Amino acid sequence: VTSALPAPLIELASGHGVATEFWDWQGNHRQVEESTIRTVLGALGIPAQDDDQVAASLRARREDPWRRVLPTVTVIRSGRSHRLPVHLPVGTDFRARVRLEDSGVLDLEHSRGAVNREVDGAKISELEVLLPGSLPLGWHAVELVVGAGERKGNGDAPTHSMPLVVAPEKLELPEFLRGDGDQGWGVMTQLYAMRSRQSWGTGDLADLADLGAWAAGLGADFVLVNPLHAAEPHPPMEPSPYLPTTRRFANPIYIRVEDVPEVAYLSAAERQLVEWHADDAQRFLDLDFLERDAVWAGKQSALLMVFRQGRSVRRERAFHAFIEREGQGLVDYATWATIFAIHGPDWREWPEELRDPRSEAVEKLRQDRSEQVEFQCWLQWVLADQLAGVQRDLRETGMRLGVMHDLAVGVHPHGADTWSLGDALARDVTVGAPADQYNQLGQNWSQPPWRPDKLAELGYAPYRDMIRAALRDAGGLRIDHVIGLFRLWWIPEGTLPREGTYVRYDHEAMVGILMLEAHRAGAVVVGEDLGTVEPWVRDYLSEAGILGTSILWFEKDYDGDGGLLPPESYRELCLATVTTHDLPPTAGYLQGVHIDLRHSLGLLNRPLEEEKAADEADREQVLADLRRRGLLREGAGVAEQVEALHRFLSFSRAKLLGVSVSDLAQDTRVINQPGTDEEYPNWRVPLAGPEGRPVMLEELFTWRSARRLARTVSREA
């Protein structure tokens, strides 16, 4: 296809991973708008607003690698040798070595220069250093000692250094999943919505432990929980767990106050006040929608009292060890939360001297407000302690994985990460998705993307720290929109989602680092790979040992009659479920509640009756498939239909199966309606029973129907 774009602009964009064309979900070839390409290049720090800038940027693109002695970072797989380019003035003597993360040193072989080029008036030679495939896994450094001649000795100070990451060739499955036909199962929950009579109006980590213990008693291997990332530290709190302020730290609303050891130090009057806050929160349990702000106001007051009690010598040492381990990232987050309380939620509107986390003004404020900063650090320590306790308890109850955390695709555009990580996150663009069959106008998620160039310059440290935090005390990790490790749809600010373009990432580095950290954590990784995906990507992830995601409603036999994909045809390396949080609970889906809801919100693309007829025909085809397989009797009610769908899924080849707590409760209400904001109470709907009445965990655990559905997934029913 002939492009109308200037050839130099196409070359520049291609060199920086910016797509100038793509294929849409209907198989149509699309050319990206020229203005979009220039804006996205600008967001990557590449001047491209006119032909002169494009020409200059192209020259820089061609010459910059020759100006750099070593690449910014290199990520390789264990067992594969790699030739590392080195650029030095012609005739320069040097010695290359790898300094291993355990402080060991290995000398490296290198070739003499075979290619020379003149750059900035100097003749530069390109040489190659051989990285052997025998290097151990880990975070190492390649060091060059220039002018060393043939001298040996590891004491020479390196002249140049580069981070080197060695990742496993493949992320191996846990032993219990390695055999042919081996399968595990677990429950999936939105923790905030799943309450008990002991929680303070929203679900907490003690509730998570109780759910896990109950499920473990039925043979479950994991509990998949929504992203627990931190939201705003003061009202109003963003309800979506997929729009956090940071992905490295967690939301203290999930703390169970009574389980903090220092509660024992409270005076009788203080303990009575904590009990009053707990009792007051009970009034939120019977409401139709969750009241996060009110819940957090009471919980924060109680936690502040506990914080001010001080700690034992042992606990104080543990607290400071946590602060030291988390480093500058924790201090930055705590400082941001403190300034937030003073100057409001958008750091871009703070006094100018406070917009830079490394400014003297920020350091002074940190000292002046040291108690508030320490309180925020303490909240994260308590969270980490309780999360570790949940994972420990679940493994002790017999779960083979335990908690599976969920990693959101991005962060709030003016939250903690955008303040503290600087230009590692792109400005003036947001992440979204092009049009597809479910969202024909495209999507804008209002989240700033990682800048691939800055991640590389930082040695992927911010990405690594985020992954490590998500994997700490976890048996598994779900990656929302795992395709974002390969490419993301960047949308210039002020434009429509369809006016964006794809920007590529170094997927070898992104996936390799994920594999290394998951290997070290002993965790399974599940990638949510729904939507528009390049055909080779799923194969790449599978070869890396990363599981995909299969949703029953989306798995159709397109080579047959268009009905359900037979369970024996499911891919093996996946987490298979009947539903997902962007669909209604299965009982609601079977009753068409999503059609009625979308109609009431004006989201249908065709008349209501036409939409209902098509939806009913699709569901009837599914139910007919179940009846033909002998899994469903004629005239069966909704509860039996839900059970039959899960029984069908249990015959699949998928390594992991999941059942939603909403399905265990026979809930029908939609958790999240894509395409809406204030029009629907997204992420504020509590767990309810079939009549729409909120249901507590204590009640759910007594339901025979819940146990029967869980056993259906485990093939025991």
Q: Which residues fall in each region the model found?
A:
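Long, contiguous interaction/targeting segments characteristic
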Residues: 1-65
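Residue-level detector of anion-binding/catalytic polar loops
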Residues: 19, 221, 400-402, 476, ...
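Short helix/loop capping segments that flank catalytic or ligand/cofactor-binding pockets
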Residues: 23, 174-175, 197, 412-413, ...
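Acidic/aromatic-lined carbohydrate-recognition and catalytic surfaces
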Residues: 43-103, 107-144, 153, 163-420
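Alpha-amylase-like alpha-glycosidases and glucanotransferases acting on alpha-linked glucans and related
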Residues: 91, 234-384, 410-658, 662-664, ...
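Short, exposed coil/turn segments at beta-strand boundaries within extracellular/luminal domains
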Residues: 149, 154-159
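Structured C-terminal cap/extension of enzyme domains
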Residues: 666-717
